[in-house]
Amino acid sequence: MKVKRKIFWGALITLGIVYGDIGTSPLYVMKALIMDAGGLNGLTEDYIIGCLSLVFWTLMLMTTIKYVLIALRADNHGEGGIFALYALVRNKKKWLILPALLGGAALLADGTLTPAVTVTSAIEGLKGISIGSQPWINTQLEVNLVTFVILLVLFLIQRFGTSFIGKAFGPLMLLWFSFLAIFGIVNLIHEPLVLRALSPHYGLMLLFSPANKVGIFILGSVFLATTGAEALYSDMGHVGKRSIYLTWPFVCGALVLNYFGQGAYLIKNLGNFKTTGDIFNPFYEMLPSSVYLFGVLISTIAAIIASQALITGSFTLVEEAVGLKLLPKMKVEHPSLSRGQIYIRTINWSLCICTLLVLVYFRTSERMEAAYGLAITITMLMTTILLSQYLKDKVNVVFNGIFLAVFLSVELIFLISSLTKFTHGGYVTLLITLLILLIMVIWYFGNKLRDYLSDEEEWVSLRDYKDVLQELSNDDRIPLYISNLVMLTKVDKRTYKVKRETLYSILDKSPKKAKVYWFVTVNTTSDPYTNYYTVDMMGTRNIVNLQLYLGFKMDHRVNLYLRQVVEDLIENDIIDEQPQKYTTMPGRKIGDFRFIIIQELLSPNTRVRGWQHLLISARIFIQNHSTNPIQWFGLEFSEVKVEKVPLLLKKRRIPAMEQRMILNPKDVKRSTKE
């Protein structure tokens, strides 16, 4: 009984988290297809049947087969999405970073349009509805104002966490999908012949039919039915693939029934429509008047839940990108006790501004739909490329070849058909995609170039300075700087190579005497939840080479991990206790800590020129305007010193100067040479 209850609640949570985007597609897909026909007057029965066939088989091929049956198997320890997939295959080919960057940037950019189009489509259903004697919302401006307020409030509450309302998302989305199915069936029973659309024949015929005025470009609107498939894959880590397997048949059935119900309503009423200046939406038009207001209300709630899921998904996506060092460090907050509840202020307000600007710029859902979906086709194409690399080791060559050929072909066709969206506003999401991609490229390749160009002379072996550090630690002539000095740096675990500036900070800048020297390296792994450490004492009791291994979804709060390491080392008698005479904590065994963070600035004394200099400079600019490393490492309440040092890349050789004159020296001691 407990197992069944657990499965039920897991399925309910999945409905509230995973299917918001794809679940609200019935609000605008058929409406967009009507616009492709030139409006209501351009509709024919063959056109409607063909559209339904294309929508059905797009859902089957793209969502069910590609994502539910294939992509969900490509999980990274339970995590899904384009960055988790990249983490699985990044060691196979270096060039795989390119589809990962492009796909991730496009997915983030497309998210700026999704909340605007879903909420606007829902609120437009209120136009003309009278509450009392007066219509509540009568103009598109009023629709936009209501949508603006809803979206703004949604972004405002993110910092407080949404767990307090998140528990209701599952039951509400269950109600939503039941609503879709019921009123789809209500209309379907009047025109059961629309079930002919289950045959792909009618969809293929429509592509070449004179009834289709836009030709292959109709697929740009059809594609809107499956835009939420990528989000379905990305959210796997929140709910587990089993819950998606259990709930997708219900969700898919509800969507198909509603699309076919809209089609049945259109066929039944062909020639009887009264064309007005208002936007015609078959989703609302097919509802009985007695449930119309409820339909608008539940649609608005579903749109808000879809927007919330997208915002949360964006936080998760960025957290993964930061962990994989594809984006600069950003402060990640946890507004609730739930491990999965995160909040990234920079992303929240960037997304808020972009979404509200999209709403103000496009104004109507009709114009948003014309621009919507272009960027997500790029993401799906990039996911296919990464998936094919993953499948190489999992399936035979023939299956992988068929998979790659089929889905690359289909998605390229969808991409080409969506290109018309560029002139209708798709350029907005593409510009945002390019901006995000530029930041990613600068950060990732800037780091790679910096490491490649680093002067070999700037790296020294920590082992070579072991004796010097121990001598400094025991030198009674030098006052104690701190009991435990922690250098946040990078030590090669095989060669012990460390940046010279690290040791320069300890030895040359007024020697820093400490009882224990900690050299801490944070290593990010492809496993999302790796959490372990290794220690190399190098034959001493006071020099600790600490290597932290953290998954790309783990917090990098060094102070918390270090506390555990210290306790473990003292308990195992690896380092000496540091009893404190003056303390508020009786029995305290360790002294005080000070963390040193070294910040690099590009030195003018470098031979790097041209595009390399530009790339490194841009990378440092982004670093200086991203999250403070003190916040990133969770050291806000620790004693931290930030030291600025020059980043020396292939030092410029300065010619030696000729000595001409030294005037009036005093008491010069000359050395004689034999």
Swiss-Prot record:
Source taxon at top rank: Bacteria
Alphabetic keyword roster: Cell membrane, Ion transport, Membrane, Potassium, Potassium transport, Symport, Transmembrane, Transmembrane helix, Transport
Stretches that traverse the bilayer: 7-27, 52-72, 95-115, 145-165, 169-189, 204-224, 244-264, 291-311, 342-362, 368-388, 397-417, 425-445
Reactions this protein catalyses: K(+)(in) + H(+)(in) = K(+)(out) + H(+)(out)
A Gene Ontology molecular function term of the record: symporter activity
Location relative to the cell: Cell membrane
Residue ranges that the Swiss-Prot or TrEMBL entry lists as coiled coil: none
Stored InterPro entries: K+_transporter, K_trans_C, K_trans_N, Kup
Signal sequence annotation: none
Keyword Membrane annotated: yes
Pfam families, sorted: K_trans (PF02705), K_trans_C (PF22776)
Membrane protein topology class: Multi-pass membrane protein
A single cellular component GO annotation: plasma membrane
Functional description taken from the UniProt entry: Transport of potassium into the cell. Likely operates as a K(+):H(+) symporter.
Family statement drawn from the similarity comment of this UniProt entry: Belongs to the HAK/KUP transporter (TC 2.A.72) family.
Name this polypeptide is given: Probable potassium transport system protein Kup
Organism (species): Ligilactobacillus salivarius (strain UCC118)
The encoding gene: kup
